[in-house]
Amino acid sequence: MNDSCSWDQLWDQQGTLNEYTGKGIDLLERIMAYSKERASIELEYSSKLKALSKKTAMKMKSESELWNSVSYVKGFHDVIAGIVPVATQHELIAENLKSAVIPFTTQKIAEYRVAKKQLESDNSNLGKQLRMVIDEMAKSHKEYVKCYKETEAAMLKYAKAEKNMDISRLELEKTKNNYQQKCGMLEESKQTYAVMTTKANEEQSAHYDRKLPQLLDNYKKLHTNRILDTVEILSKCVEAESCVNQIIASCHNDMRRDIGLIDPSRDANLVVENMKSGHPVPQPFVFEDLGHPQDRSSFMGGGASGPAGSMDGMDATMKKGGTLMSKNGKGVARKQSMHQKFFGGGTADKKTDSGDYGTLPPQQRARKIAGKISDLEKEKDRATQSREGVSKMQAAYRENPKLGNPSDCDAQLAQYGHEIDALSNQIQKFKILLDDVNAQLGAGGLSATSVGGSDTPPSIRSVSSASSGVTSRVNTINDAHRTNGGVGGGRRESFSGSNGGSDTDPTINGNGHGRDELYEECSNPNPVLGEAIAQFAFDGAQDGTIRMEANEKLWLIEKDEGDGWTRVRKENNSADGFVPSSYLKVTWFGKV
């Protein structure tokens, strides 16, 4: 583009120039409106980001300790936390727009509107002044033309009168005087017209050569300054955002660093460490040889030797859940719950949980106790430091009584002493618990009495302990079978009485003859007390339990005695055992 272009060439385009200048100022107003809306959007965006981060963090707090400690979840936590400083920077963008861009733009818009109005007024005044001089020249020219025509008419009249011989001399003189008068007026109007023409030319020359170029130069200055201010305003808009880009980039780098700390191997170890129970795997199943049915034909007829009959009674008693033999040699027909079969003990051994993580599996309990010990030791250290601080303050009071009364510190020292003693007792208690748990974990599993003695409810003790306990009973029975020569060596006598279900205690003599046994026949299973439908599947992996499928129909042969287990039998009488009571939908027959 040619740089020599002059605004003087726009001498006849003032109207278009005014319209163009007004549009430039309107653009500044549009920039200001953009800045206001952008600031509002940035504030809303910042607020929504912070709300999102807070809402997500609140959801994370409700998760488990393991879930929040694995590195990939922690990485997500850190990224969410990193959103807050990013949101703060967007809030700063809005503040920069409000403080640096909008006020400056408002000021410039007002200045340029005033300047434009002044230029329009100056342009109007210059035009009016030029038109006024030109109008005066046109008026004098019109007067001059009028005088010229009147003089011409008077001259023709005088020439005609001079040739007319009939006109009087007086009339001729009168016509001549009129002609001469008109010639004077013509000369006077001519002089006036000449003066006004000169004045109009001078004014027009000044208008187009000096006044209008100066006005156009003012338009040019306004145009240039407005564009420069537009550039500055746009730069401020960009600077309002770019000044925080470095901080936002730093936040993003921190997020990348946190993401880089995600360690799958460490997470896998944490999962194992937090989920492992410490229970040993189930022990192998013990094969129980029942012999051949032909070997039982002798006791089916009513005769049997003492040892074999005793063994059969023992077997029947095991099926019923009673104890094998009392000290005086008498069998005790006493039912045993699933809870007692698995974990031993009765209701007298049940105690409430002391709050020492007794409901957790051994391995997790040991980890929790160790963490509790660490927390208590930290509390003890803080209490010890506080007591030392009070002791130093008391010593300072003793050296300088003006600072305070030393006896005022005695109450605090006593309080800290009690706290330290209580924390020490707690630490010692948990250390003993931890030693017990670690010792039993090192022994390969928990015994029937869980860590912490009977403080831990038997219902939550290790199932592996129950498995080993029941397995040992089965081994004892097998040993008895082998010692007495197998099941076929004797017979089982039925108990006397018309009901067949008497609960009187039977006595067993040495040779097995003349006994009133309570034990049931092997071929006579427990009576059916009701029916049940399995609501859920159960694997029956532990000893004494039975596998069942969802919606499977089962016979109820023993009620839940408060331990959460119910004894059932398959519908085809193929097997019986215990299942969780909560897994069943039961229907009892009559009064049970």
Curated annotation (Swiss-Prot):
Keywords: Cell junction, Cell membrane, Coiled coil, Cytoplasm, Cytoplasmic vesicle, Endocytosis, Endosome, Membrane, SH3 domain
Pfam family, one: SH3_1
Annotated membrane topology: Peripheral membrane protein
Compartments (UniProt record): Cell junction; Apical cell membrane; Basolateral cell membrane; Cytoplasmic vesicle
Gene3D superfamilies assigned: 6.10.140.470, Arfaptin homology (AH) domain/BAR domain, SH3 Domains
Ranges of Polar residues composition bias in the record: 447-457, 495-510
Superkingdom of the source species: Eukaryota
Chain segments annotated as coiled-coil in the UniProt record: 363-441
Domain (SH3) ranges: 527-589
Domain F-BAR per the UniProt entry, residue ranges: 3-267
Biological role stated in the UniProt entry: Plays a role in protein trafficking, actin organization and embryonic morphogenesis. Potentially acts as a cdc-42 effector. May play a role in hypodermal P-cell nuclear positioning. Together with toca-2, is required for protein trafficking regulating yolk protein clathrin-mediated endocytosis by oocytes during oogenesis and retrograde recycling and the sorting of recycling endosome cargo proteins such as mig-14. Also, together with toca-2, controls the distribution of actin at cell junctions.
Subunit note: Interacts (via SH3 domain) with wsp-1. Interacts with cdc-42 and (via SH3 domain) with wve-1.
Protein name: Transducer of Cdc42-dependent actin assembly protein 1 homolog
